[in-house]
């Protein structure tokens, strides 16, 4: 019994000793950051009176290289006035004291920034540093961000006949915007627009957006970085509501939306709901362009790279496409069906037709290309018209149902785009689309303003 008690006492002593923390290292220690500079992409400066926008949160680790515990202090060199914010192991503030770091272990530092207006028309750099100290020795991580002033529009019903003409700084839309019925929203050449994640532009009136080849109108998500150029679902999109009409988009570049442009219902007074010329709509989560019993004309347009559809004509409508390229590289979504779709009916979840409307679609001198064997989807109810007038197109299709005459189309040949995986759909030398266009069209320039020569090339780009 005495031996057992002695054994237990010895065991408890060993456990107690093993649980004791190694002694603190009091002398100077050079902590090891995972990077010497933390870069933030361009960030819009703050809207006056608002915390918007705030950057994404970036993370760095700072390692204790020693075989002993240390206590580290962290500080922003800019103090309370810094544009940056830090959080170390759950403790936030411009100055954080006594953070314990185990031997050969690391702590994580979370960094955000929000930038004050700088009164510049171009992005201006903002710098600060994180200082990490142990025993008087300092390690430094430089923080760098570019701040860009903007004209802000937030949750607005636009005044009738609003015109955006300023090109000194971009416009940033935060929340939804509405164009009232009977009003026109005009945008001048060269205007840049960035839309937040919860932005949808609703249109009861009409749009008059007319850029030029050298000064297109651009609208995209509100993270101005080349890394996000081709990412979908950064904002909602443009929604032309029922009874809107006669909207026109020329030389526009619309990207990064969930649904690029949705158009509802035939216009009351004739004409088109939407006419697009020399316009690009790309990198959309659902569809680039979707018409619901709408009337849409597109000339020299590029609709590319969407989760489901580059073009959708749903429940009838009238659609006229000339010299358009509709292409998908398969990098957005995992669709199993064609990205160009037309239907004169609407079905319920059991596949039963619940509504029908006549459909008429003309397509001339266009390209429809993608990674599927069949890039067309047609759903035609025999009870109402489903009229197609297709000619002189290059299409990836099995032509099931025999909707397209084989005599004046090119089926299932590689159009030889320059770099489709990078979203570049210009034609290369030797493309079967070169000089194959109908001579009856009178389109004198391509999407970029380059002069077309007879016979024209198919698609939105003339080979040069």
Residue ranges and their predicted role:
Residues 20-25, 31-59, 89-422, 432-447, ...:
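Beta-strand/loop edge motif enriched in small/polar residues
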Residues 6-9:
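Sec-dependent N-terminal signal peptides
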Residues 77-95:
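Short, solvent-exposed loop/linker segments at beta-strand-coil boundaries, enriched for Pro/Gly
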Residues 15-18:
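C-terminal motif of bacterial Sec signal peptides marking the signal peptidase cleavage site
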Residues 64-83:
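Short acidic, flexible loop segments centered on an aromatic residue
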């Amino acid at each position: 019994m005495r031996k057992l008690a002695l054994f237990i006492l010895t065991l408890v002593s060993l456990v107690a000793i093993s649980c004791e923390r190694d002694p603190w290292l009091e002398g100077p220690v050079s902590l090891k950051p995972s990077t010497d500079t933390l870069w933030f992409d361009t960030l819009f400066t703050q809207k006056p009176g608002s915390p918007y926008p705030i950057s994404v949160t970036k993370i760095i680790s700072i390692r204790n290289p020693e075989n002993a515990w240390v206590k580290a202090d962290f500080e922003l060199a800019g103090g309370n006035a810094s544009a940056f914010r830090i959080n170390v192991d759950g403790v936030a503030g411009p100055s954080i004291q006594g953070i314990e770091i185990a031997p050969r272990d690391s702590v994580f530092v979370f960094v955000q920034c929000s930038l004050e207006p700088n009164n510049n028309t171009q992005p201006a750099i903002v710098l600060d540093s994180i200082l990490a100290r142990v025993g008087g020795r300092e390690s430094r991580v430089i923080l760098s961000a570019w701040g860009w002033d903007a004209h802000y529009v937030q949750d607005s019903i636009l005044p009738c006949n609003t015109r955006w003409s300023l090109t000194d700084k971009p416009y940033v839309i935060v929340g939804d915007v509405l164009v009232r019925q009977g009003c026109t929203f005009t945008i001048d050449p060269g205007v840049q627009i960035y839309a937040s994640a919860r932005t949808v532009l609703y249109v009861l009136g009409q749009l008059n957006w007319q850029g030029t080849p050298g000064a297109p109108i651009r609208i995209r998500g509100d993270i101005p970085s080349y890394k996000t150029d081709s990412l979908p679902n950064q904002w909602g999109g443009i929604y032309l509501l029922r009874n809107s009409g006669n909207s026109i988009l020329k030389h526009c570049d619309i990207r990064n939306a969930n649904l690029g442009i949705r158009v509802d219902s035939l216009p009351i007074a004739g004409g088109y709901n939407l006419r697009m010329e020399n316009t690009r709509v790309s990198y959309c989560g659902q569809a680039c362009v979707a018409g619901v019993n709408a009337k849409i004309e597109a000339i020299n347009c590029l609709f590319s790279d969407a989760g489901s559809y580059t073009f959708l004509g749903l429940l009838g409508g009238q659609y006229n496409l000339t010299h358009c390229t509709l292409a998908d590289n398969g990098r957005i979504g995992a669709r199993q069906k064609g990205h160009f779709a037309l239907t004169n009916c609407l079905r319920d979840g059991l596949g039963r037709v619940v509504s029908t409307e006549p459909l008429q679609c003309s397509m001339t001198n266009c390209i429809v290309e993608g990674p599927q064997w069949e890039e067309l989807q047609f759903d035609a109810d025999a009870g109402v018209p489903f009229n197609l007038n297709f000619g002189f197109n290059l299409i990836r299709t099995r032509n099931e149902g025999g909707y397209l005459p084989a005599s004046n189309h090119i089926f299932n040949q590689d159009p030889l785009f320059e770099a489709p995986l990078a979203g570049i759909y210009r034609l290369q030398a030797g493309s079967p689309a070169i000089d194959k266009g109908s001579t009856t069209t009178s389109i004198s320039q391509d999407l970029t303003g380059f002069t077309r020569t007879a016979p024209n090339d198919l698609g939105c780009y003339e080979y040069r």
